[in-house]
């Protein structure tokens, strides 16, 4: 093709057409505007500076012009050929065929020409017929695509002997736009199979599939099955009951919970259990860059679902397309929300029409069919069969139009409020973080087809996995299986290498690597006897626990399975108080409910720094095997208005979704100082946070099975409303340890350290230099003694294992000083006495309490007067 030089005044469209013809499209199977646009932007960088939408329109215009030019050229060539044949000699001796056209130098021209012929051939005639044609159910399939092509043969190929006379007919004019309903662009498709590449969105919108899983593939969802049965199973299986009672059946269910808790799996299991089609799409499959197409996809989804009713529509991550309209950043988001609301409301309207109008029309048709059956066969059995079929048809027609919509999100607070009212998403089901019993059931379901050892303990694994959701447990099982395979190969390597005993350790390692390659590549399959002896053992799961980090831990949950009461020395009084307030209500909830105690307790621990307040909170959460959320006071504060309050709400919502749960607020004085500019120096931002905390702790909504532990070393600046009953009921003072308690703490800290026999921990704990030592100071003392023992070993060039001697402790005592001064210690003791006096304060003379009348006396201004 001759290269053209364009001047500044030449038509831009011709330049673009010339560049399209120069493109190398030999390796492409599908040509459309998007593909050609991307190729042009790759080859010619100046097109990247143009707006994408406007440039696509230019490409579309150029493609249409190319098709028009090709068709006109082909028509003129055919006319010239016919004229030459007529003017040729009438000699019958030899028939000379017209010369074949030279092969085209551009593949695009050939493909566009063949596609143009195919479209003209398949164009329906303009003459109308009296018999109405049955409308194709799937209008999205182009006319030139064979929808029944199930093999790899090209059934859509064009016959090379087809004449071009149809090109010149008036009814065969090329169309301006060859639209495909998937994206609204010109599509030129040349493929050898029926794979509709790029149209997976439309397939999900138009095809409902019945899943193969059911409730037997789930575990730990027994608490949700009752709501599912009431709001999904009953309306789909027996809608006639609701119509007979004159009530509208439920239409929508909103599943919310943390990521990986099983929302999508539950929706598929519901459809599989009921044997109804499921339209499962992601919210991003609905969105489109073309204005109005996103709303059209929502309408298409609901219309196709109504055509296949009864069925279920499942929209995953619905918060992506239905955010709050007042805070939406784009008009498209508002339009999608409005369209979704309209479609959900139309389900009730269609249901009422189907229950009144459609059965009557169907009844007339069924009566006519019944008469035809009686005319053909007058036997009574045929009449009875026809009437039974009519009753079944009426029942099926009655079910027509009932569609359940299930939405899934992990951010329900971001949904538009109009979606969460009656008639739309009637019921909200929370799938929180499973407890120990639910984790055990999930583990049994996931490992049902795995070969586990005979004495496998499900309860122990469930105990060691607090905060794990279904996806985390599934990942844990896969990691355990990987560890099992590695253990099997390692045992084979050790068995094989033990036979060869004439090599050094380094040589043995090299041989093991070579043997591993031999086992993986050239080794024959293991015998059935050996395979039967292979199992996944408990040790494989315990190794996997060290590698798998639950997703909830990244969202603020903290799983502390390693801290127990054994790691906490002394503090027996504080431990007893925490056991009565938190541990027992979590372990034995029924006993407390039978006594009428349903509100969980809150505990405020205060005292000097380093006395073990945070360690106690971790230990109590680990002992009761509850979910644990650790919140540092300042991390919830945000400079933007409303963000701090939202963070507080999110913490309590997350805890309620994963109950029983313990929320631990460290440095609580930074989060809840006194309001009104008191000693804490509160301001408007912190006052709003305090108000939000007060509401969440003891507001209109009960915090069921959500326990609160707060720790601070400045209880005097905390807002007084926080410490009233119903919020932080108990105030526990954690003092500096006594000499006896210091000895117990030292024993706890040194149980993993090699200590010489001459070390007397009681003497160290009662030493006067340890006076006013906190737990953190004692931990630093032990660490300093161990470091001195290591340094002494290096100085003496000793090869024996180092042990901590009494000299090391004496050296550490000479260097470590108490972190809490004597003045601070007295201040904390005085503060504790003041708090106890304020709570134990009673009237001096209880017998002289003035008694007032039952009816209050008011003055003329309606002010109460107390005598």
UniProtKB/Swiss-Prot annotation:
Coiled coil: none annotated. SUPFAM superfamilies: P-loop containing nucleoside triphosphate hydrolases. Residues 110-122 have a biased composition (Polar residues). Keywords: ATP-binding, Nucleotide-binding, Nucleus, Repeat, Ribosome biogenesis. InterPro entries: AAA+_ATPase (IPR003593), AAA_ATPase_domain (IPR050168), AAA_lid_3 (IPR041569), ATPase_AAA_core (IPR003959), NLV2_N_sf (IPR038100), NVL2_nucleolin-bd (IPR031996), P-loop_NTPase (IPR027417). It is found in: Nucleus, Nucleolus; Nucleus, Nucleoplasm. Residues 70-203, 351-370, 834-855 are annotated as: Disordered. One of its GO terms (molecular function) is ATP hydrolysis activity. It comes from the Eukaryota. GO terms for biological process: positive regulation of protein binding; regulation of protein localization to nucleolus; ribosomal large subunit biogenesis; ribosomal large subunit export from nucleus; ribosome biogenesis; rRNA processing. GO terms for cellular component: nucleolus; nucleoplasm; nucleus. The keyword Transferase does not apply. Belongs to the AAA ATPase family. Involved in ribosome biogenesis. This is Putative ribosome biogenesis ATPase nvl.
């Amino acid at each position: 093709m001759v290269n053209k030089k364009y001047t500044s005044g030449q038509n831009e469209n011709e330049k673009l057409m010339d560049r399209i013809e120069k493109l190398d499209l030999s390796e492409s199977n599908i040509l459309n505007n998007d593909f050609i646009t991307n190729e042009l932007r790759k080859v010619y960088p100046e097109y990247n500076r143009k707006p994408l939408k406007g440039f696509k329109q230019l490409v579309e215009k150029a493609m249409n012009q190319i098709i028009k030019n090709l068709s006109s050229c082909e028509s003129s060539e055919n006319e010239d050929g016919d004229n030459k044949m007529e003017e040729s000699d009438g000699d019958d001796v030899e028939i000379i065929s017209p010369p074949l056209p030279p092969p085209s130098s551009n593949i695009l021209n050939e493909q566009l020409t063949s596609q143009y012929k195919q479209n003209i051939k398949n164009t329906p005639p303009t003459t109308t017929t009296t018999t109405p044609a049955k409308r194709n159910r799937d209008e999205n399939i182009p006319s030139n695509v064979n929808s029944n092509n199930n093999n790899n043969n090209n059934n859509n190929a064009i016959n090379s002997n087809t004449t071009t006379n149809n090109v010149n007919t008036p009814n065969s004019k090329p169309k301006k736009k060859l639209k495909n309903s998937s994206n609204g662009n010109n599509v030129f498709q040349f493929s050898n199979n029926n794979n509709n590449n790029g149209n997976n969105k439309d397939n999900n919108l138009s095809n409902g599939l019945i899943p193969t899983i059911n409730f037997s593939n789930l575990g730990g969802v027994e608490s949700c099955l009752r709501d599912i049965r009431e709001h999904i199973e009953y309306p789909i299986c027996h809608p006639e009951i609701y119509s007979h009672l004159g009530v509208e059946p439920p239409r929508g269910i909103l599943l919310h919970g943390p990521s990986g808790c099983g929302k999508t799996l539950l929706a598929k299991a519901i459809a599989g259990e009921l044997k109804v089609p499921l339209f499962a799409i992601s919210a991003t499959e609905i969105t489109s860059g073309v204005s109005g197409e996103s709303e059209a996809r929502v309408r298409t989804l609901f219309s196709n679902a109504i055509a296949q009713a009864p069925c279920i529509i499942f929209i995953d991550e619905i918060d992506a397309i239905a955010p709050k309209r007042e805070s939406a950043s784009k008009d498209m988001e508002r339009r999608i929300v409005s369209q979704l609301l309209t479609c959900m409301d139309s389900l009730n309207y269609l249901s009422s029409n189907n229950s009144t109008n459609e059965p009557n029309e169907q009844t007339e048709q069924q009566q006519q069919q019944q008469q035809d059956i009686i005319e053909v066969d007058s036997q009574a059995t045929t009449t009875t069969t026809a009437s039974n079929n009519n009753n079944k048809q009426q029942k099926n027609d009655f079910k027509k139009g009932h569609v359940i919509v299930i939405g899934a999100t992990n951010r329900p607070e971001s949904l538009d409020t109009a979606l969460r009212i009656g008639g739309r998403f009637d019921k909200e089901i929370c799938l929180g973080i499973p407890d120990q019993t639910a984790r055990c059931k999930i583990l049994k379901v996931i490992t049902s087809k795995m070969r586990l050892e005979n004495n496998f303990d499900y309860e122990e694994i469930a105990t060691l996995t607090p905060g794990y959701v279904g996806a985390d447990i599934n990942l844990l099982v896969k990691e355990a299986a990987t560890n099992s395979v590695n253990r099997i190969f390692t045992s084979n390597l050790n068995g094989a290498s033990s036979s060869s005993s004439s090599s050094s350790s380094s040589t043995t390692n090299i041989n093991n690597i070579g043997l591993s390659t031999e086992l993986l590549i050239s080794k024959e399959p293991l015998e059935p006897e050996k395979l039967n002896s292979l199992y996944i053992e408990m040790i494989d799961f315990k190794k996997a626990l060290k590698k798998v980090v639950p997703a909830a831990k990244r969202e603020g949950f903290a799983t502390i399975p390693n801290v127990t009461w054994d790691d906490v020395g002394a503090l027996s009084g504080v431990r007893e108080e925490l056991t009565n307030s938190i541990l027992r209500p979590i372990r034995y909830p029924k006993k407390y409910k039978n006594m009428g105690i349903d509100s969980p307790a809150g505990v405020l621990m205060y005292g000097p720094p380093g006395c073990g307040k945070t360690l106690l909170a971790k230990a109590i959460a680990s002992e009761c095997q509850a979910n644990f959320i650790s919140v540092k006071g300042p991390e919830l504060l945000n400079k933007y208005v409303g963000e701090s309050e939202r963070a507080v709400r999110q913490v309590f919502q997350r805890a309620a979704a994963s109950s029983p749960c313990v929320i631990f607020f460290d440095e609580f004085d930074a989060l809840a100082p006194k309001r009104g500019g008191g000693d804490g120096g509160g301001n408007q931002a912190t006052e709003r946070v305090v108000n939000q905390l007060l509401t969440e702790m003891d507001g209109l909504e009960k915090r069921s099975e959500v326990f609160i532990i707060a720790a601070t070393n400045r209880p005097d600046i905390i807002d007084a409303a926080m410490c009233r009953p119903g919020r932080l009921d108990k105030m526990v003072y954690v003092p500096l340890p006594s000499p006896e308690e210091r000895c117990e703490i030292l024993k706890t800290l040194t149980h993993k350290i090699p200590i010489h026999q001459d070390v007397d921990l009681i003497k160290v704990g009662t030493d006067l230099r340890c006076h006013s030592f906190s737990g953190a100071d004692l931990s630093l003392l032990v660490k300093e003694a161990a470091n001195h023992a290591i340094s002494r070993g290096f100085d003496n060039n000793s090869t024996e294992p180092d042990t901590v001697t009494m000299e090391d402790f004496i050296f550490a005592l000479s260097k470590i000083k108490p972190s809490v001064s004597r003045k601070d210690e007295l201040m904390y003791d005085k503060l504790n006495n003041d708090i106890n006096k304020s709570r134990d304060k009673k009237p001096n003379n209880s017998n002289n309490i003035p008694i007032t009348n039952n009816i209050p006396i008011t003055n003329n201004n309606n002010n109460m007067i107390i005598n």
